[in-house]
């Protein structure tokens, strides 16, 4: 049973469900369509005190692959908008990569922040 909603596991679950749903919309004659499902969950900067690190987990599923990425932020030197922008850039990078575009948008992470890829 899932115990943390802000986790790689939850992002993967979301991506898999989104992929399954996208398949249900596909007409059988459209077999060259590049389907994907994407999931993103995060605990990012807020105006109230919150324990734990600022982080986000993104997963993307296709018929042949499942990739997941975890972003860890410097919560003392980031605000919500800057974290949201980085997450958005990584989501765009994921979608672009699925479609064969490998020219990633730079995330401009701080020295003590990281992007970790799994799967």
Give, region by region, the residue ranges found by the protein language model:
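Short alpha-helical segments enriched in small residues
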Residues: 1-105
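Non-catalytic propeptide/linker segments at domain boundaries
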Residues: 103-119
